[in-house]
Amino acid sequence: MKQTNYHLFDFMDFDPSLQKKESIWKAYAPSKIEERDGDIVVTVPYQKQLHQEDMAPDVDAPQQSYDLIIRAYEPNIIRLFTTMADDVMTDEDDMLQFAPEVQRLPLHLQGSVCCDIVAANGKKLATIDLSTPRLDHWSDLLPAPQPVPFITFYPDGDETKGIALSDDHFSPPRYDALPLGFVSCDGIATNRTERATISFKCNPDEHFVGTGERFRKMDLSGQTFQLKNQDGQGVNNRRCYKNIPFYLSSRMYGAFFHTSDYCKLSLADHSTRSVQFLNEHATLDVFLIGGRTPEDILRGYRMLTGFPAMPPLWSFGIWMSRMTYFSADEVEDICHRLREEHYPCDVIHLDTGWFRTDWLCEWKFNPERFPDPQGFINRLKDSGFKVSLWQLPYIAQGAEQLEEAKKNKYISQPAVDGFPIDESTGGSSNFSALDYAGTIDFTYDKATDWYKYHLLKPLLDMGVKCIKTDFGENIHMDHQYHASTPERLNNIYALLYQKAAYEVTREVAGDGIIWARAGWAGCQRYPLHWGGDSESSWAGLAGSLKGGLHLGLSGFAFWSHDVPGFHSTPDFMNSPLDEQVYVRWTQFGVFTSHMRYHGTCKREPWHYPNIAPIVKRWWKLRYRLLPYIIEQSEQACQSGLPLVQALLIHHPKDRQVWHIDDEYYFGNEFLVCPVMNKENRRDIYLPKGSWVNFLTGERLEGGRWYYDLEVPLDQMPIFVRPDAVIKMYPHDVDSTDDMDLSQSIAITINNDFNGIAL
């Protein structure tokens, strides 16, 4: 759709023509403010606007008033809730999982003209300015501005960084952002639901990060995002597998929009003076999270939506996969060679080829190619390998479970008579020619139990240790679901799906872990997630890191990616891999929380003899670093930190780092600078202080750039601080089964440190 000259209407998906039978309602100054059960309730009148491009009140339409509930929680959280529907504010739902520290703070009012909202601990958390704006009147050329709710919030009590509602306009009739508003359908049947909006003021130099696995540059200011999960189809476009309705601002606050609806977020884009949020449902539920550091804010977000669970030790080892292995013999040959040639590895993953028919997911092994699945899994276990299996949440036409699923309504049901239109996989990375009859309905408890105990448990009982919960970004949108509309379910479906798989895996296999692609708020509780179908190229490598950094700034601790990218180019399935990309992606993978080789053609390193020795050395380094990785992971599960950390987490006042998306901290000690080009060169920025190259021992001073450094193919720039202590494992192993972490040693980066030999 072409952009109009009225950006507010563009943002609100609004057409002022009468034919649409929709109206914008703008919030006015509060008509009433009161204390109620520890909350502050602000009655906000809304005035309907005329159907014209120059906004003006429709004085013939009576105002409608709705309550804005302001609630505070320890620590440093303010909640804003208003609904034009019949929704009720709740502290318990699928997205929310409050930590014990999150306790309500009673609020009370002080003052009248300038009304302060003060917490029981004495902190001023908001101001409602009811004073009359000052004027020096000399002209009647333009109408006077409409009344405005002037409300400013201070979630951590710091009045120097107030978050104010934004009434942003060029002239009184020409609005760019509304502080609060909604769109009504005027009682006319429409395909579009009612929509509600809220806006906050932002500064000219303000930066924004987060919003999910965003394959974009680090600073997201000047961009608008449609928060609707969809198959990303790679990592170099606007689509997104994992949208998270949360952002973090360089002014040191975060905003979490508690919704599963389709929504839009404009970060100083439609208006450069405003952050604007649009929810395609007539309810707004916003948590403003304060803090002194990004880690404080991210921890506050996790305190609302849940902390990640700790994955098992073996999951931090190397995973080997391909799309796909087709037989037990093929898999066992690969596992034998990994052991024979001393490539350390913990997990073998079977993708789409373990079924009776490739891609026809029936949760059962092909009896011809896997004649003894129990013996197959046992033999791999004896060799130190865990088994991971691919599946997806749709029941295909022809699947043996279809009739049972339809009869018992375990899958979504067509909303109209006739053959259902499959919108769950259309235009996506599902490369099968199958038709899907329905989406497993996780809003229905009986369907969830059927999935957990009828489909997954028999596999887990055999000894399978991980389920790849692929897809889940899309559902059948033309179907009916037990306890939700498809519009409200689509985004949160990933959470319900992954929770079910995670819970039964932990219950039966003993280890809580999945391998998931989609995501929404709360999914970080059920690790782990990987970055989807990246291109095996320099662009795919760079895009993957960007996505991982933003996901870590959206509450996720654990994240992986396909090494060395998922698909080939230009021939998706058949073009050979670039060996330099293979090495550089391997080096990057060693310094991420989890490391899986996967893709459309052969990924085993011996197929690339020119680089196999380099790859093996980096694999061995990965296992030597596991004590450090486990230590940092345990800390991440209790804090706000991810494993892959944007530099801004540690240096929020350094303006440079809000623009750096090709370097990162791995845990709290390593500064990692992947090489992402065939020239084997890169620029490096080192934050202030002294730094030591972990591989060579070279000392460098920070607070500056180092330009055009040459990096040999077998090296990657990795830096640590002087006096850092790095836990390492002193022995080579074949898998984590061979490790006794009590034998770990501590490497101190002192004056005698000359680097770690690969």
Model region roles, listed by residue range:
Residues T83-A85, E92, D136-L141, P145-D158, ...:
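Aromatic- and carboxylate-enriched substrate-binding clefts and catalytic-loop regions
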Residues Q63, R239-C240, L248, F277-N279, ...:
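Active-site-proximal structural scaffolding
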Residues Y502-E507, D511-I513, G519-W530, G540-G543, ...:
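Catalytic core of carbohydrate-active enzymes
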Residues K2-D13, S23, Y46-Q49, D60-P62, ...:
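Catalytic and substrate-binding clefts that recognize carbohydrates or anionic sugar/phosphate headgroups
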Residues A56-P57, D67-L68, G232-V235, K242-I244, ...:
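Generic recognition of flexible, low-complexity loop/linker segments
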Residues R36, A72-N76, G111:
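Residue-level recognition of beta-strand termini and adjacent short loop/turns
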Residues M12-I69:
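N-terminal-proximal low-complexity accessory segments that begin disordered
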